[in-house]
Design a protein with these regions (language model features):
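Acidic donor-binding loop of glycosyltransferase active sites
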Residues: 260-269
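Conserved N-terminal ligand/cofactor-binding loop architecture of enzyme catalytic domains
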Residues: 20, 24-92
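A short helix/loop element that forms part of the nucleotide-sugar donor recognition site in Leloir-type
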Residues: 181-193
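Active-site-proximal region of nucleotide-activated glycan assembly enzymes
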Residues: 120-179
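Alpha-helix C-terminal capping/helix-to-coil transition sites in glycosyltransferase folds
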Residues: 99, 143-144, 260-261
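Extreme N-terminal starter segment of soluble prokaryotic enzymes
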Residues: 1-4
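Glycosyltransferases and closely related glycan-assembly transferases
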Residues: 89-103, 112-128
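Donor-nucleotide binding loops and adjacent catalytic segments primarily
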Residues: 191-261
Length: 269
């Protein structure tokens, strides 16, 4: 069997969910061939970095505008999807090259692109939509989806109310990598009775009120803090040597290690 996993680097959550799916497929069946692609990079190779950069600037500096656009696009049911003859031609090239037995999408842009292609061409390859947001947005819904992987029972009920058959929905939670599945803290006993706080804002390090938060944590006795700034290099440079009891780290793949270490995790929604 061959599985094609499609995602997009709009934030790191969708990408990490795709990585987790690939990891689990390999664990379940070593003979399964897994191919993971960033669909935006495949469709728009010359401007994908510009698009990702613009997205990052918006969520870092204009998150209020981004949230407004996100909510309004849901209410107005505005579809933002790659379409057109040139896009279909590129999708056809990808699918003919890979010849997948199943397609798994962890970003709504990918869902819409593949669903539209299936509708136009009659492609019979099953489409699995893995919803990697904790709230439902209309962009995730596509009639051409054969199976939904829902993060919560509430989202399953929402899909059913929208007309999706219950047997086409599995409540799986958001996929996580193997390292998160065994969060044993027994070997990390806190002998000094220091309270340990982990602060992180996802892969992009989105933490707008960090000055106030770290100032408050620094003022508390017996509190040790680790801040993970992700790929936000500016934030890392600003805080890396600010407080002795606050350790600042950049992007890391080993998040589970620091979650096991912490007594409290403060992060974005």
């Amino acid at each position: 069997m061959k599985v094609l996993v499609l995602s997009g680097r709009f934030g790191m959550g969708h990408e990490m969910a795709a990585n987790a799916i690939c990891e689990q497929f390999r664990k379940l069946d070593k003979d399964t061939e897994i191919v993971k692609k960033d669909l935006l990079e495949e469709l728009y190779p010359h401007i994908s970095k510009l698009i990702f950069g613009g997205f990052r600037l918006m969520v870092e500096h204009c998150h209020g505008i981004y949230n407004f656009i996100y909510k309004m696009s849901g209410k107005m049911k505005v579809e933002m999807q790659p379409r057109g003859a040139a896009i279909y031609k590129k999708l056809k090239k990808i699918l003919e090259k890979e010849q997948p037995d199943v397609i798994v999408c962890t970003h709504p842009m990918c869902v819409k692109a593949i669903a539209s292609y299936k509708e136009k061409t009659g492609l019979s390859t099953p489409l699995v939509t893995c919803i990697t947001d904790i709230s439902m947005h209309p962009e995730w819904k596509a009639d051409q989806t054969d199976l939904y992987l829902a993060p919560t029972r509430e989202i399953k009920e929402h899909l059913i109310c929208e007309g999706t058959k219950a047997e086409n929905i599995l409540v799986t939670g958001i996929p996580v990598r193997q390292q998160f599945l065994n969060m044993d803290r027994n070997h990390l006993e806190n002998e000094k009775k220091v309270r340990k706080v982990l602060v992180m804002g996802g892969g992009l390090g989105l933490m707008p009120d960090l000055r106030r938060l770290l100032g408050k944590l620094h003022s508390m006795q017996s509190v040790q803090t680790i801040v993970i700034t992700g790929k936000n290099h500016k934030m890392y440079e600003e805080w890396v040597n600010r407080y002795e009891d606050v350790k600042v780290l950049g992007y890391t793949e080993n998040i589970s290690k620091y979650m096991r270490w912490a007594d409290l995790v403060i992060t974005k929604a």
